[in-house]
């Protein structure tokens, strides 16, 4: 049903609501998964959006859907039908993820590791659903060697030519912070509460004890750092489907696409959109970036 309504297209950083997505028949992964979760929940099927903030082995990120079936969470693409659950284009990519999380409403009492708790939501760690994990741990110390309580610790992967924090934690009274991640290397950055003193280091996947980070004034940090970051090796989640199931799925996808194409055919053509934009004193090029149904 979701495939009949929506197909993939890139968009800007502001996520469309499910209604806007279905009106336009387009959505990027975050919008497709938001739409699919809304549809599943509307039918009484427990579902949640999961998200890897940044890949470790390639640029960009991804969001998809988990659905609760027979006492377990299973994954699927947002508007990407497959022959069975736990089959998607990202079976291999997800096995190389350093961090996958989900946001749930309220206080969470499930089995997953809690990353942070806000007023209305809890962020939980779902990485172990997709790849073996290990504990990435640090102890942050002040310049005098005492534990730095409340320091911010950013666990980062290299993506789009920057160190992007996939998770940020605060240290406890012992200066400790730790998170379960995939078996890859991380860049870790720590800073005190006033953000006046900082420290950074590389956390290798095979580190057997917490790394010690000693905070120093920002001006005293090294000018350069040589490093090598290795992402987790691929160990693709097995895709289990018979040839008959896959053939049946392909036929349904063709039918789904034909239904969506019929809806898209009702859209105003670009020429009409440009004329309307001029009439309403809008920028024509901007009007071409959005598709609006009748």
Question: Where are the regions that the model predicts?
Answer:
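Short, acidic Ser/Thr/Gly-rich low-complexity loop/linker segments typical of extracellular
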Residues: 159-180
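Compositionally biased low-complexity segments at domain edges in trafficked proteins
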Residues: 214-273
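Hydrophobic/aromatic-rich core segments of domains that either
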Residues: 1, 9-19, 24-116
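Secondary-structure boundary elements
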Residues: 1-24, 259-287, 291-294
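Short, ordered, surface-exposed loop/turn motifs in non-cytosolic proteins
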Residues: 142-162, 183-185
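A short, amphipathic beta-strand motif
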Residues: 134-144, 223
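Structured interaction patches on ligand/partner-binding surfaces of diverse proteins
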Residues: 193-219
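Short Pro-Gly-centered beta-turn/loop motif in secreted/extracellular proteins
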Residues: 70, 173-194, 203-207, 286
